[in-house]
Amino acid sequence: MEQDKLIIRGARENNLKNISLDIPRNKLVVMTGLSGSGKTSLAFDTIYAEGQRRYVESLSAYARQFLGGVDKPNVELIEGLSPAISIDQKTTSNNPRSTVGTVTEIYDYLRLLYARTGVPYCPNHNIPITGQTITEMVSTVMSWPEGSRLTIMAPIIRNKKGAYKDTFEKLRRDGYVRVRVDGEVKMLEDEIELDKNRKHDIDVVVDRIILREESRGRLHDSLETALSLANGMAVVMTGDREELFSSNYACRICGFSVPKLEPRLFSFNAPLGACDVCHGLGITEEVDLDSLIPDPSKSIRQGGIRYYKNIVDTENIEWQTFATLCKAYKVDLDKPLKDLTKTQMHAILYGSDRPIAYSITSSGGNKYTRNDYIEGVKSLIERRYVETTSSMSKEWYHTFMFESPCPKCGGRRLNEQALSVRVGDRNIHSFTLMSVVQALDWIDHLELTETQAQIADMVLKEIRSRLQFLKDVGLEYLTLDRLAGTLSGGEAQRIRLATQIGSHLSGVLYVLDEPSIGLHQRDNARLIRTLKNMRDLGNSLIVVEHDEETMMSADWIVDIGPGAGIHGGEVIANGPPEEVIATENSITGQYLSGKQLIPLPAERRKGNSHSVDITGAEEHNLKKINVKFPLGKLVLVTGVSGSGKSTLVNEVFMKAVQQNLGRAKVKPGKFKKIKGLENLDKLVQIDQDPIGRTPRSNPATYTGVFDDIRDVFAATPEAKLRGYDKGRFSFNVKGGRCEACQGDGVKVISMNFLPDVYVPCEVCHGRRYNEETLQCTFKGKNIYDVLEMTVEEALGFFANQPKIRTKLQTLYDVGLGYLKLGQSSTTLSGGEAQRVKLASELQKRPTGKTVYILDEPTTGLHTDDVKRLIAVLQRIVDSGNTVIVIEHNLDVIKCADWIIDLGPEGGDAGGQVIAVGTPEQIAAHPDSWTGQYLKKALDWTRAHTRAEDGGTTCQD
């Protein structure tokens, strides 16, 4: 009998306090609780990790070494576990070859559709391409200049791996003498060794002819032989000219040929179909002249060319070579670059048009003479950028580069042959330019012949269902060519969700991390319906979520708490939603019932009368909109997913401000004009990226409080006696740290096909410092003891140290009292990292001219955490600064001073300003989707506020 519940006993991962619970299987289960309470530790680090570990354990030792091991979570027993799949918030891929189409596998089905039912059209004459007859091929070749030396070849292997020894042997037996392998002609009598792991092109040389009228018959026979050898393909070469003939597909007027239609022809990741200039990326990188020569009014000697700025007039070999080039073209090094002639600038950028004799002296005093072309600075940087293997050098060259659409394919990624094939009225690239909704409509109205319809039936069904799944999870505005790396965490997660639904698996345990993030309230119902459909297929869903609508729609809620960090890790409630609401000590239940809420501010701020006004913004889908950002207010930018919020704030507003403040490399999105930038002197972006990439980074080092703590220890009597300065108390430098583990506290032992093992350092026993350093104490505690304290404990410990206390207080105020000062930054959640950054900003003296930008800051935050976040944002605005937030969370939106609502829909149907004003004004707007849901939120808040305290609404 199948077990109907998931049994967990003795879970102690991270902050979990030996918890035991039963969760029903094949249900939609929501895990909730404060940020840092232990939800993720239970859902991902315990349940999913154990499911993954059991799968990996079932594989052979050989397979395990490629997968990397999975540690056994700290839990006594888990029973009733299904195969587990995790769908988390991580963005899909930053690989420029990864698109929405490839991630969802829709593009794979499209390639199949175009290969089996596509019709090639000549790009020059717009007529369908049909196979050429041998007579037509002969006529084409006979039109070439008489006396041409022809080589007729059969392309038998194209871009395939193998050593092909048997192939060469058969060709020898058949009497052939020569083959062309990877562009090089070889004799078959010689031993030809090929790397079987590399892809090769092999052409058999069928005949060599001098073109005359009397050789027509021989040409006909040779072409016939080549066509039979290479499945209807033949290559005729003369000098630099090489033409591919096909009895399959070629234009009868100009001879434009298309290879046999197969799926890989339509892949921009395969050499057969990819554009040969950009290799399928759609973009090329070249030197940005504005970056290379930022100020043309400067001369070369004044550092006008940034690349040579620091080596002008030195013995550097690069400078000696460049100075020779300048001398050859009579370039005056003291003349402004803008006054040089076109010929001189061309030589500086692209190099000499003739060999130049010159000599250079090495640093060792040796003299070398050369007579060669000298490379220009632009050509030099572009060549080295491609050739260098040093990441540091590549980074340096990259500072001069900018991306532009490929000059050959125009950003379409594919070669002319692949783009010539159409289904209906579109080639495969123009299909990917459509949004999900447009693509669905196009497929529904696609007209095919009876044969084509029969072939395409199954493929179209797969494409249609996958597009429908994307629409169901609220992503109907995405285009299939959208780069996966440009998706938000929520979008990426919902794409993976759509892919999973498309696989129609059952009996699986899905663990999801806040799928509602980045989704407008309007689209929430569709997402919930999707999750229920997955459950109804016979799957178990565990969803880490804070969205109230999702919680109320769940079959079961597990509430972890009561607080965060050391104050959490317990099961507060475990049952249906109504049971959680009735649980007195459940903070989640109190917010669901309305006993606790986020109140409305007592009044909406009037601002400081200044604003930043943008006119004619038209980046991505923005429709030449005019937007006013009032300063000195809490400004919310809202709208359905894909309406253009991130484009307006991050691409246009933020980059325009950064450029005005001197960030040279930043290129703002397109707009006509902007005014009011003089009212801002600083911009701070507070995102959810980690505060550090290494385990050495922690909240104490990031906020700067660790410097002050080290000052305190350096001032202790013992430290003074020993002559220790503050550097002695750093675990990053030699002196005070334990050298056995270099201040890490642990050692990593590689176990080959087993996971790496982390063992405490046997010298310092995990304490990071050497014994002498730890002997210096302050109030009975050494530096390691302080790093092990929580923010809350440290506040009391350093009560008489105002500098330290102030910094710790800001961490406490943003709700991070439970964090250890020395907790590794890599273990912090996105929400925690963001609040550490906020705390760090709160410590700084307000300028009144600073603008803070936050993109969906409520990700990973419980309603109680959101309450704290709003209080912090209000504090920042109270000090005279401006905060601009992109957000869907109604609790944040209702507390705004000013809202800019975009829409009406996502993608092409968005990009317009629907409404601006206070929350009350937006709620009253008939065309605003945000307004409809905001009105309900405002009414609910007011009703519950009156019920609680007799009618007052106050600022938290």
Model-assigned labels for residue ranges:
Residues 1-956:
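Conserved phosphate-binding elements of NTP-dependent enzyme cores
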